[in-house]
């Protein structure tokens, strides 16, 4: 293995190993501080982060507001308190010189307010902000206000060029690095564009090279690119290390830090990760954000897949092939279906899927009465955790705080499920984000006999090339 040398990033020399930030409440100050203390760049998530009571117990985020706007205000307050708690713990563990980054999603509810609130209250504790999920144009000016480095997450050179031309060129001195996130391999939400096929992955080398060529045109040849998604053993990336064509490269690990002693996820979740097989992680379109995302196949995803399959197109009047009448809801309001679809509907109803829910796309999906009640309750309980949500039709922009469409029952409340799984909820019935290489836990001798390393042991291991 080539020697893995420190690189210059954010004004200092660090190991080219970056911890990937995972919200809700999975990348904590504990994990971040230990990673930074080991010489890499630690990252805690500022997405609905946990705060703690005087005894160190997690304060569960309970909402009391009458409207979703009121609850959104509570969410922002929880977000700032949680971000501060994680920043303090990260800095305590990292020591004065460890590099601590906060990860936020630009499309999370109240992103800008939470980011400013945490940076305001945590002066001197945070060295950098990593931000993806959308086009975070304002990241540069916020970084300048608080004098921290910024690290946009992009999945193409084109996205970076747009950010650079619109705002980053004005604050180039604080651009610490650019994260290239492989949209086919990374865990969690992915930046697949409309021109890319979820089923046709493209190898990262050419895409990262294009990004570097764009960056060189802007005079950014020495700004590191951080490769995220699909990184496991560094010996597999030897042709990327010290490669003059690519320039300085660091590597981001998001999935591997899930299985560490400091990782806050449940033992059941850790053990499940250690037994995954190739193909157990699914790139799927059900997220209320509108982005594709990658998660472990389980009953939760299977329910969403089947719900989306139990779907028929409807018309408000008989037209074309829509000639079969069907009554929707308690008042049996008439819509028209294709006769073949009516047969399918009768079969679903016979199997217990008796509730027809309308979608924004002039279709009906069929669910059980219990499922229907749960969907409705989750939509009603919305606390505005995204800038806009297709599941509940919330948007954080006034005057009426709705996206103007019907709430979409083909999706789910992401805040509810991520909070639940992060705090010992059942792993079969929640969204379990992971990268596509997670099956390698089961093949990597490092984890044999169910071994769970500390974060520092993991960093040492990665430095051996494996």
Predicted regions mapped to residue ranges:
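Short glycine/serine/threonine-rich phosphate/pyrophosphate-binding segments
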Residues: 27-30, 233-237
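Active-site entrance/lid segments in N-terminal catalytic domains of soluble metabolic enzymes
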Residues: 1-220, 400-405, 410-466
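A short glycine-centered flexible hinge/capping loop motif at secondary-structure junctions
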Residues: 226-233
């Amino acid at each position: 293995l080539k020697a893995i040398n420190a690189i210059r990033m954010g004004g200092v020399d660090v190991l080219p190993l970056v911890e990937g930030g995972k919200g809700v409440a999975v990348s904590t100050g504990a994990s971040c501080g230990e990673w930074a203390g080991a010489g890499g760049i630690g990252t805690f998530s500022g997405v609905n982060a946990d705060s703690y009571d005087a005894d160190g117990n997690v304060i569960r985020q309970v909402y009391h507001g009458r409207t979703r706007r009121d609850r959104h205000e509570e969410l922002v307050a929880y977000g700032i308190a949680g971000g501060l708690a994680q920043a303090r713990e990260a800095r305590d563990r990292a020591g004065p010189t460890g590099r601590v980054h906060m990860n936020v999603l630009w499309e999370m509810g109240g992103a800008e307010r939470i980011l400013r609130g945490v940076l305001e209250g945590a002066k001197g504790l945070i060295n950098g902000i990593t931000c993806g999920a959308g086009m975070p144009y304002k990241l540069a000016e916020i970084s300048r206000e608080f004098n921290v480095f910024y690290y946009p997450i992009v999945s193409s050179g084109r996205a970076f060029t747009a950010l650079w031309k619109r705002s980053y060129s004005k604050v180039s001195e604080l651009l610490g690095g650019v994260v290239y996130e492989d949209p086919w391999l990374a865990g969690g939400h992915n930046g697949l564009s409309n021109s890319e096929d979820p089923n046709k992955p493209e190898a990262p080398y050419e895409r990262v090279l294009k990004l570097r060529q764009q960056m060189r045109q802007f005079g950014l040849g020495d700004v590191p690119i951080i490769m995220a998604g699909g990184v496991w053993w560094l010996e597999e990336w030897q042709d990327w290390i010290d490669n003059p064509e690519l320039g300085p490269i660091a590597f981001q690990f998001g999935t591997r830090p899930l299985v560490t002693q400091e990782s806050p996820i449940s033992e059941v979740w850790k053990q499940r990760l250690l037994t995954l097989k190739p193909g157990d992680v699914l790139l799927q379109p059900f997220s209320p954000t509108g982005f594709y995302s990658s998660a472990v196949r389980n009953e939760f995803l299977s329910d969403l897949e089947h719900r989306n399959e139990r779907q028929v197109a409807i018309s408000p009047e008989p037209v074309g092939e829509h000639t079969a009448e069907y009554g929707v809801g308690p008042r049996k309001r008439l819509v028209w279906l294709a006769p073949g679809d009516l047969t399918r509907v009768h079969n679903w109803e016979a199997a217990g899927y008796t509730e027809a829910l309308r979608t924004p796309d002039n279709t009906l999906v069929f669910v059980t009465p219990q499922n229907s009640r749960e969907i409705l309750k989750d939509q009603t309980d919305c606390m505005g955790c995204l800038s806009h949500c297709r599941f509940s039709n919330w948007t954080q922009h006034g005057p009426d705080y709705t996206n103007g469409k019907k709430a979409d029952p083909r999706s789910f409340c992401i805040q509810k499920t991520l909070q639940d799984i992060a705090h010992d909820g059942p792993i079969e019935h929640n969204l379990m984000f992971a990268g596509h290489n997670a099956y390698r836990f089961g093949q990597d001798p490092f984890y044999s006999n169910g071994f769970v390393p500390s974060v520092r042991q993991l960093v040492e291991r990665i430095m051996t090339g494996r």
